[in-house]
A protein has these predicted regions:
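Residue-level preference for nonpolar/small residues embedded in alpha-helices
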Residues: 24-25, 62, 136
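Short, flexible active-site-adjacent loop segments at beta-strand->alpha-helix junctions, enriched
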Residues: 7, 12, 83-87, 119-121, ...
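Short active-site-proximal "capping" loops at secondary-structure junctions
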Residues: 11-13, 46-50, 160
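Substrate-binding cleft and catalytic face of glycoside hydrolase catalytic domains
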Residues: 29-107, 111-123
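N-terminal carbohydrate-binding accessory modules
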Residues: 1-40, 53
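Conserved beta-strand scaffold positions in the cores of enzyme catalytic domains, especially
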Residues: 5, 45-47, 185
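Extracellular glycoside hydrolase catalytic/binding regions
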Residues: 21, 97-101, 105, 110-114, ...
Length: 187
């Protein structure tokens, strides 16, 4: 399925604290699908950065509402962890894993909800990734899979591509280490 849509930032913005949370109405979500032909909302649900001290789950109640509204509008909802302007970094792997342990079970039965492991977890392009970065992707994938075995998982959210084989190298590594691509994809 080709995904097309809009993004929402509930992680506090870039930098953290610069952007207020916006909750779209049911009517606006319905319009995205019916009038504009979109099928997806991409949500930076919470942020992993040095300036963001909010605990995992601080947006859960609002996310529950958005999950319901997206379902009613026949929209996919991609949930991810933002960077708060510290793009290309993992500030706290503990935060990321706790995020998926919290939200994975919460939405695992919602077939319109997809999980993006972490938005822009490494600097620059796919060519700058090293095996440790791929190991981090595996750890996130395994944590999500333990909590939500059937939810679509989006991996390898690059900022850009520098050489043609970069993604293939990462996909080969992840495949060798157990990613099941029948229910996972490159973001």
């Amino acid at each position: 399925t080709l995904l097309r849509g809009v993004s929402l930032s509930w992680d506090g913005g870039d930098p953290y604290g610069s952007q207020a949370k916006f909750m779209p109405s049911q009517a606006s979500l319905d319009a995205l699908a019916q009038e504009y032909g979109y099928n997806t909302v991409h949500l930076y649900l919470e942020g992993d950065s040095s300036g963001n001290t909010d605990p995992v789950g601080y947006n859960a109640a609002d996310c529950d509402i958005l999950v319901e509204r997206c379902a009613k509008a026949n929209l996919y909802l991609i949930i991810t962890i933002g960077c708060n302007g510290e793009n290309g970094a993992i500030h706290s792997m503990d935060f990321i894993l706790d995020f998926w342990r919290f939200y994975g079970p919460r939405y695992k039965d919602r077939t319109h909800v997809l999980f993006e492991s972490k938005n822009e977890p490494v600097h620059f392009t796919a060519a700058h990734w090293v095996p440790k970065d791929w190991e981090d992707q595996m750890l996130m994938y395994e944590t999500i899979r333990a909590a939500a075995p059937h939810t679509m998982v989006l991996l390898l959210s690059y900022m850009g591509f520098r050489y043609e084989g970069a993604v293939s190298d990462a996909v080969r590594y992840l495949t060798t280490h157990g990613v099941d691509w029948s229910n996972a994809a490159v973001a």
